[in-house]
From Swiss-Prot:
It is a multi-pass membrane protein. Gs-coupled receptor activated by antipsychotics reserpine leading to an increase in intracellular cAMP and its internalization. May play a role in locomotor activity through modulation of dopamine, NMDA and ADORA2A-induced locomotor activity. These behavioral changes are accompanied by modulation of the dopamine receptor signaling pathway in striatum. Modulates HTT level via cAMP-dependent but PKA independent mechanisms throught activation of RAB39B that translocates HTT to the endoplasmic reticulum, thus avoiding proteasome degradation. The gene is GPR52. InterPro entries: GPCR_opsins, GPCR_Rhodpsn, GPCR_Rhodpsn_7TM. This is G-protein coupled receptor 52. Disulfide bonds join 114-193. GO terms for molecular function: G protein-coupled photoreceptor activity; G protein-coupled receptor activity. Residues 66-87, 138-159, 225-265, 318-361 are cytoplasmic. Its main location: membrane. The chain crosses the membrane at residues 45-65, 88-108, 117-137, 160-180, 204-224, 266-286, 297-317. Belongs to the G-protein coupled receptor 1 family.
């Protein structure tokens, strides 16, 4: 009798151990079951790399704006700074799934951690996407209404717009705490998020109709019309050159492309990157919530592809701004100059005499 009870107890322990191991080794890309290290290595490397790039890139943008007061005179800088702060917090928040993949306990119930993390990331990405749309509207007004632009876009209105963006982003994902469904797949690193917190077709449609679709439409509409205006300006310039040929015009044509064409190329890159990173996520979000497709690998890849937009934002929107590039160059020169001054001071200070066999540069 005792032996039979002991056998049953061992079987139960072994089965529970197998379940725990499978739960512990479940990795989003399906490369779990590591026999040597109990870590989702590939997923951890991807998230850590993205976290480092997002934090480093957006910290650079924030630091340049802080040290270059000239940038504050441009209305676009309000949205770029807001986007940089939101994307920076996205990078910091990405440390949470990294710790989960490394199997560090958060000290909080997994369901609560999953819900809070998913909500925060969704809000931050919403702020970032709304800022992208506002930047496109700002550039559209600057080109289509240059005379009344200063009256339409004032610092006070910009601050109100940024506050409304944060409030709207916080409210639109709030129903996820009241059983409406999962707001995204950012928390699917957690086991509870992936298996117990399901998406809802109605809530997904609600988010897409009130956030993703309007932002994508605004970006596409404004940049398409800006691109169209740039082409029209280029055509008018070429017509004037044909009517009034001169040596200066010919030489300027040979030296490089017109500013309108360069600006159009910047807009093309911005729009292309935006849709390449966000469109796969939105499509999968709709298909999975409609129970048409369910693939953890696609969920992981599309989610972190969209999150990588937080790094691409600071690269494209900042480096495409000539004033920002100037501020970054001056900041780099200042830092290099200060380093050289420190080295010169150290060189001028008397140093103890070195022995003959010591190394000196």
């Amino acid at each position: 009798m005792n032996e039979s009870r002991w056998t049953e107890w061992r079987i139960l322990n072994m089965s529970s151990g197998i379940v725990n191991v499978s739960e512990r080794h479940s990795c989003p890309l399906g490369f779990g079951h590591y026999s040597v290290v109990d870590v989702c290595i590939f997923e951890t490397v991807v998230i850590v790399l993205l976290t480092f790039l997002i934090i480093a890139g957006n910290l650079t943008v924030i630091f340049v704006f802080h040290c270059a007061p000239l940038l504050h005179h441009y209305t676009t800088s309000y949205f770029i700074q807001t986007m940089a702060y939101a994307d920076l917090f996205v990078g910091v928040s990405c440390l949470v799934p990294t710790l989960s993949l490394l199997h560090y306990s958060t000290g909080v119930h997994e369901s609560l951690t999953c819900q809070v993390f998913g909500y925060i990331i969704s809000v931050l990405k919403s702020v970032s996407m709304a800022c992208l749309a506002c930047i496109s509207v700002d550039r559209y007004l600057a080109i289509t209404k240059p005379l009344s632009y200063n009256q339409l876009v004032t610092p006070c209105r910009l601050r109100i717009c940024i506050i409304l963006i944060w409030i709207y982003s916080c409210l639109i994902f709030l129903p996820s705490f009241f059983g409406w469904g999962k707001p995204g797949y950012h928390g699917d690193i957690f086991e509870w998020c992936a298996t117990s917190w399901l998406t809802s077709a109605y809530f997904t449609g609600f988010i897409v109709c009130l956030l993703y679709a309007p932002a994508a439409f605004v970006v596409c509409f404004t940049y398409f019309h800006i691109f169209k205006i740039c082409r029209q300006h280029t055509k008018e310039i070429n017509d004037r050159r044909a009517r009034f040929p001169s040596h200066e015009v010919d030489s300027s044509r040979e030296t490089g492309h017109s500013p309108d064409r360069r600006y159009a190329m910047v807009l093309f890159r911005i729009t292309s990157v935006f849709y390449m990173l966000w469109l796969p996520y939105i499509i999968y979000f709709l298909l999975e919530s409609s129970r048409v497709l369910d693939n953890p690998t696609l969920s992981f890849l599309t989610t972190w592809l969209a999150i990588s937009n937080s790094f691409c934002n600071c690269v494209i929107y900042s480096l495409s701004n000539s004033v920002f590039r100037l501020g970054l160059r001056r900041l780099s020169e200042t830092m290099c100059t200060s380093c050289m001054c420190v080295k010169d001071q150290e060189a001028q200070e008397p140093k103890p005499r070195k022995r003959a066999n010591s190394c000196s540069i």
